[in-house]
Amino acid sequence: MPRIPTVELSRYLLTGHIASPGCLRARAALPGKNTRVALGGAPLPSRQLQPRQHARYLTTETSFANPSATTSSPAAAAPFRKQLKEQAKALKKSGHKKKKSSDNQTVPGWELTVGIEIHAQLNTAHKLFSPATTSFNDPPNTHVAPFDLALPGSQPLFQPATLIPAVRAALALNCSIQPVSRFDRKHYFHWDQPSGYQITQFYEPFAKDGFITLYARDGIAAEDGEEIKVGIKQVQMEQDTAKTTAQPGDVQWLDFNRVGVPLIEIITLPEIHHPATAAALVRKVQMVLASVDACVSGLEEGGLRADVNVSVRRTDDPSGKLGTRTEIKNLSSFKAVEDAIIAERDRQIELLEEGGEVKGETRGWSLGSTETRRLRGKEGEVDYRYMPDPDLGPVVIGEDLVARLRETMGVLPDQEADQLMERYNLSAKDALSLMLLDGGARIQYFYNVLDSLEERLVADGQAVPEGAEHATLAANWCLHELGKLTDSASSSSCSDPDVLEGLAMTPLGESPLVPSSSLAAILHHLYSRTITAKVAKDLLWAVYRGEIPEGGTTSYIDTHGLWFKELPEEEYAKLADEVIQGEEKILGEFLRWKQGKMKAYPQGKLMFLVGKMMRGGPEGRVEASGAERVLRRRIEEVYLPELEKGE
């Protein structure tokens, strides 16, 4: 057997470069172009520190330096949500209309069956089998240990601390923790896995037999009723692979910072029968993992990846056997999960109705696609040759650790959603949006704002008010008004150079662009009726643009004379009389309501007139609730009696 030249072996191990495809010993070139693989792009970059965002792991410090020190990378891709918006615009322009999701959950005569595999990066300080620290934003190849590169003589060293978020995640998913689990080798060769195998837990995972309950508020299909329970077969620990970035000229850049980062793979039972329910499950799992601080980031940020197995069968099939399944790999958004399942279901049904046969294969899905694409067939599947890892002993998890983690679990998403709806009077949609936004950080931001707001009310000599009015105000602003900032920022029609994109929210629920204390100061004045809602919104924009420093809200209001000087009652009444003139048709609706001819109070018409009062009154002196109160009293006590007399 020929000996591999030392130079060739070194170039592969240290830089990931292979001069020719195929076996290094045979050096047999394959037809077609060669693909060059560069470790982070040519030579190993220096360890010069670069700016990065705050990593999810809270003990990891952020490094700062001149960004020009690194090798330039391709221009950043447009934000994921912006890509979806652009594609929606293109579809609308072309006149192509998609079915509503709610109309596309079933096909008469056919049953869909879906199983899901979710891979989630764990929130840990170190990699799974090396002392190298985890990194998600640092320069490429600066967090790499010898074992991560499979250098000769290096051995795996299991890091026990990685068990903590893994067990916490499994408990949150109602799994049974196994006292003993073992690691196996999954063999395959690819440039993103230097050792030629991945260490996983194929035979003896650390957690089994769990379940997750989905409710109507989670977005499940209407056909599934108010709730559905989906079983979880197992949860296993495994290594992540290197991050591959395609470059022009058939070049792949490899970042080995990600090699060996601990993952958990969550495998559900095939108990899902509607596409919307599958997407809801992935969304719910992400929320559960974030709530117990087990996962680094969400689906759209790359910290969570989903594969789905799809099969169909006729509902009148006497055998009752499931159809042949296909697997769709690496779905990167909740919408992609639902759309890909619908497309693959329809493809399989069409094939079977034409007399064809569904083949077991792996398929792919691209953003904005209308159909799945074939990646490889069953005959092309790799024989992974699973075998126990001889270098790693069994993992023993004590009942004392399990009990301790169960006691310190904290509030899970269902409990938190119930609290937001019952205590703060939020709708189910708003509660879930708060919990999902910014990778789960928006809900913490809301609590920070609420705490700061209540401190200010107490400092004013007020007791923390009973009921949920102030909390509902804070929640609505944290969700809707902050949402308007980011919507405007991401809009392609927004040309304001001062408008930034996103809120740069940290895992601790803070935003350097809109600090929670600044929003609380605005809401304190709004709740106390010392500024109007319009002024409050203008102040929020000023904070976002950096015009108001943290702690400077009150002085800014003073300097610009923005304090609310409310009109006296008689001025409100005069303004109400002015807007009512000529609105006999609207007054007629109020009269029909009073006479019992209409069930619902015409609130929309009332607010239309309030809007006229706001626009017609002195700038900054008309307060909406005061205008509504006076207007309603004038209509019911003055104008309706006059109309009744005239009948």
Curated annotation (Swiss-Prot):
One of its GO terms (cellular component) is glutamyl-tRNA(Gln) amidotransferase complex. InterPro entries: Asn/Gln-tRNA_amidoTrfase_suB/E (IPR017959), Asn/Gln-tRNA_Trfase_suB/E_cat (IPR006075), Asn/Gln_amidotransferase (IPR018027), Asn/Gln_tRNA_amidoTrase-B-like (IPR003789), GatB (IPR004413), Gln-tRNA_amidoTrfase_suB_CS (IPR017958), Gln_synth/guanido_kin_cat_dom (IPR014746). Its main location: mitochondrion. It is found in: Mitochondrion. This protein may be expected to contain an N-terminal transit peptide but none has been predicted. It comes from Neurospora crassa (strain ATCC 24698 / 74-OR23-1A / CBS 708.71 / DSM 1257 / FGSC 987). Keywords: ATP-binding, Ligase, Mitochondrion, Nucleotide-binding, Protein biosynthesis. The lineage of its organism: Eukaryota, Fungi, Dikarya, Ascomycota, Pezizomycotina. The keyword Ligase applies. Belongs to the GatB/GatE family. GatB subfamily. This is Glutamyl-tRNA(Gln) amidotransferase subunit B, mitochondrial. Its EC number is 6.3.5.-. Subunit of the heterotrimeric GatCAB amidotransferase (AdT) complex, composed of A, B and C subunits. It comes from the Eukaryota. It holds the Pfam family GatB_N.
